[in-house]
Design a protein with these regions (language model features):
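C-terminal motif of bacterial Sec signal peptides marking the signal peptidase cleavage site
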Residues: 17-20
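Bacterial N-terminal signal peptides that target proteins for export
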Residues: 1-10
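A compositional/structural signature for long, glycine/proline-rich flexible linkers
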Residues: 22-196
């Protein structure tokens, strides 16, 4: 028997033995256990399904009335929201919104914010596809000063580039960003639009 034939035979026996070791008997699952597992799967998956539904409406489906634009492009609404605005649950009437989806599959994105008046509240709420609010940039967390924040997906392992204030990691490669800018009254709407 040649050396190659012997090696192939030994390898075949080893693979067969490993496969036999991994064989498991079927696990008996009661209907109650199956239902409990299904409930857990639903609770786990529902936020991602709803997040993707919003992603699709905002970035892909141009016929959808909630369409905002392509990935990585900010869409702002310097106006007062009413009960007719249903894309976001309970929109605020005193913090006009900007919304956008980031696609981090190819590379991180940089969010640069200008210096804000000290008395004006603003923030960027960053939400991953699991609907976890994983970071905020703005008055309550980073202050009202200017800054540049690198938003990176789960696979990015680079060093913080020069000029970047902070690196923010997301669990998912798609991130929903909601910006709120304080409106001091109807006469302030032009200033909010300028900020946005």
């Amino acid at each position: 028997m040649s050396k190659n034939t012997r090696n192939v035979a030994v390898l075949t026996l080893m693979v067969g033995a490993l496969c036999a070791c991994g064989a498991n008997a079927p696990v008996a699952v009661t209907p109650e256990e199956a239902e409990a597992t299904a409930r857990k799967a639903y609770v786990y998956g529902f936020p991602m399904v709803m997040g993707y539904k919003t992603l699709n409406a905002y970035t892909n489906d141009t016929s959808n009335p909630d369409y905002k634009g392509p990935f990585n492009k900010v869409s702002c609404a310097a106006r007062l929201f009413t009960p007719e605005d249903k894309a976001v649950v309970t929109p605020n009437a005193d913090t006009p919104y900007c919304m956008f989806w980031l696609d981090l599959r190819a590379e991180p994105q940089v969010l640069s914010v200008p210096e804000m008046e000290p008395e004006r509240f603003y923030h960027f709420q960053l939400v991953d596809l699991y609907t976890h609010n994983f970071a905020y940039v703005g008055t309550l967390t980073t202050g009202n000063g200017a800054g540049s924040f690198l938003i990176a997906g789960p696979d990015w392992n680079g060093e913080k580039p020069h000029g970047i204030t902070d690196v923010i990691h997301s669990e998912t490669n798609f991130v929903f960003a909601v910006t709120r800018t304080q409106l001091f009254g109807p006469d302030d709407l032009a200033r909010v639009e300028e900020i946005q």
